[in-house]
């Protein structure tokens, strides 16, 4: 009976399965980080274990009573999402469907990243997991922020504001990086988990993106000039 109930829940979660997966991964990450902090708490370890025991005694009966509620609620919400999705697919314009599909892709990618983060935490410990997260953060910031800024920078008001704001942002980002590096070298190991702002990489990526856009504009301009010249020659030929 329990197996049938479990299978029916798994089949029912057609839209929100990623929520359950993400929750499991988050709980696993928090558990690993808590265990790491407890093992490295030094003289406070015994006090932490006493508090942990007291909390477990109080929370366990409550958990046993309500443990099935979140899953039942998730199944109910999943059914509602299914109804809304059907109506949306039936009546929504193509552009809206495209946006929703892109959101689904992002959610899928985020779930994959969460799985990789938990895997790193389990195999290499919290530091390896944070290093992985910092690498992914750096890649995301460099690629996506540069593309967005390159598009926005085409508008004159934003371009003028950016010329003033970017040097200030670069200055404070460098100050932040120096502070994190100095504190890490002084022995504050937890500070070493903080990601650095990849200022140089962002600048290089922006220059590359800007050059690519300018090259694309020049190519379009040359094509326009060629077309105009061809039209002019054709007009001259017709007049003769």
Swiss-Prot record:
Disulfide feature: none
Coiled-coil positions: none
Pfam family, one: REF
GO BP terms: cellular response to hypoxia; developmental vegetative growth; lipid droplet organization; pollen development; positive regulation of growth; positive regulation of response to water deprivation
Annotated segments matching region Disordered: 208-240
GO cellular component: endoplasmic reticulum; lipid droplet; plant-type vacuole
InterPro entries: REF (IPR008802)
Family: Belongs to the REF/SRPP family.
Protein name: REF/SRPP-like protein At1g67360
Organism: Arabidopsis thaliana
Higher taxonomy: Eukaryota, Viridiplantae, Streptophyta, Embryophyta, Tracheophyta
């Amino acid at each position: 009976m329990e197996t049938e109930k479990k299978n029916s829940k798994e089949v029912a979660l057609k839209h929100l399965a990623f929520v359950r997966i993400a929750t499991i991964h988050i709980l696993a990450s928090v558990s690993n980080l808590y265990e790491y902090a407890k093992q490295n708490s030094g003289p406070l370890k015994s006090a932490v274990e006493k508090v942990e025991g007291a909390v477990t005694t109080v929370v366990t009966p409550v958990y046993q009573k309500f443990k099935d509620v979140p899953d039942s609620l998730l199944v109910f919400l999943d059914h509602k999402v299914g109804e809304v999705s059907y109506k949306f697919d039936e009546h929504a314009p193509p552009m809206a469907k495209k946006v929703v599909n892109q959101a689904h892709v992002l959610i899928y990618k985020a779930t994959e990243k969460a799985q990789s983060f938990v895997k790193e935490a389990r195999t290499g410990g919290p530091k390896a997991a944070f290093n992985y997260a910092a690498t992914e953060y750096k890649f995301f910031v460099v690629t996506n922020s540069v593309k967005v800024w390159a598009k926005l920078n085409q508008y004159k008001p934003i371009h003028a504001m950016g010329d003033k704001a970017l040097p200030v942002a670069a200055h404070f980002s460098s100050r932040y990086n120096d502070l994190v590096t100095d504190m890490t070298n002084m022995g504050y190991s937890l500070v070493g988990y903080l990601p650095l702002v990849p200022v140089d990489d962002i600048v290089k990526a922006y220059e590359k993106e800007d050059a690519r856009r300018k090259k694309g504009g020049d190519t379009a301009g040359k094509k326009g000039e060629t077309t105009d010249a061809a039209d002019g020659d054709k007009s001259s030929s017709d007049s003769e």
